[in-house]
A protein has these predicted regions:
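N-acyltransferase acceptor-side catalytic subdomain
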Residues: 1-238
Length: 238
């Protein structure tokens, strides 16, 4: 199957089926649930990908034949690797993502100042609306997130998957506990409180120069709350 890849190739699988072919099994090199480009091939220190490319492709071909696989998929590789494989004749699929870049902004207000007046007013109104609904939004670094809050966020995560996919998600409660325990300094959890209740949350992973938005969920629907927790708070942090 293709679950958890965040690359939607269902139409390819359907095309194979309509032509009497089997799309599965397929070979996959990826980091599960992570639609962000990065290293996907483990190489010894000092070894360049170009040095092993021919051997790699030959081995992949042999493994495809041995397993009866239709294809090999390398998801979200680093750009140089993707370009070299395209030159070697592999199909190169281009996806579209939207990334926000900090172009030297000092803070969120500085970011707003570069916008046209209409858009600036709109964003201010959206953020103000969250507070007007009685919501308090806080951004917590990993060390400040306790076990009960991780438990709560796992519930949010399950609700999002249940609403969109009809199942409770791929990651269990223990995953989030271990995440908070093993790499707390690399985590940012944005929570929204309504009275005494935590009603929504968004989880980010902090990289060397990038903030990665990962999961979100809520138990109450409020106007603009998704944008506040998943976009504006992230921009604020950056």
């Amino acid at each position: 199957h293709s679950y958890g890849e965040y690359v939607f190739d269902w139409s390819w699988a359907d095309a194979y089926r309509r032509h009497g072919q089997h799309y599965y099994p397929k070979l996959l090199s990826a980091v599960p649930f992570t639609p962000a480009a990065g290293p996907r091939l483990l190489l010894a220190e000092g070894v360049a990908f170009a040095d092993l490319e021919n051997e790699l492709l030959a081995t992949v071909g042999e493994e495809m034949a041995r397993r009866g696989a239709s294809s090999w998929h390398l998801l979200f590789p680093e750009q140089p690797v993707a370009e070299e494989l395209a030159v070697a004749g592999l199909g190169h699929r281009t996806g579209v993502q939207f990334h926000w870049h900090n172009r030297g902004y000092r803070d969120f207000a500085d970011f707003l100042d570069v916008m046209q007046s209409r858009k600036r007013k709109q964003l201010k109104r959206e953020r103000r609306l969250v507070a007007e609904q009685g919501l308090q939004v806080r951004a917590l670094r990993g060390p400040d997130v306790d076990a009960a809050l991780w438990e709560r966020f796992h519930h949010f995560y399950q609700l999002t998957y249940s609403r969109r996919s009809g199942h409770g998600g791929y990651l269990n409660r223990e995953f989030f506990r271990l995440l908070g325990q093993g790499m707390p300094d690399s985590l940012l959890l944005v929570i929204a409180e309504h009275g005494r209740d935590v009603v929504a949350g968004a989880l980010y992973v902090i990289g060397a120069d990038t903030l990665y938005g990962r999961y979100w969920g809520c138990v109450e629907d409020h106007a603009q709350l998704h944008f506040e927790t998943c976009y504006y708070q992230g921009i604020d942090f950056c």
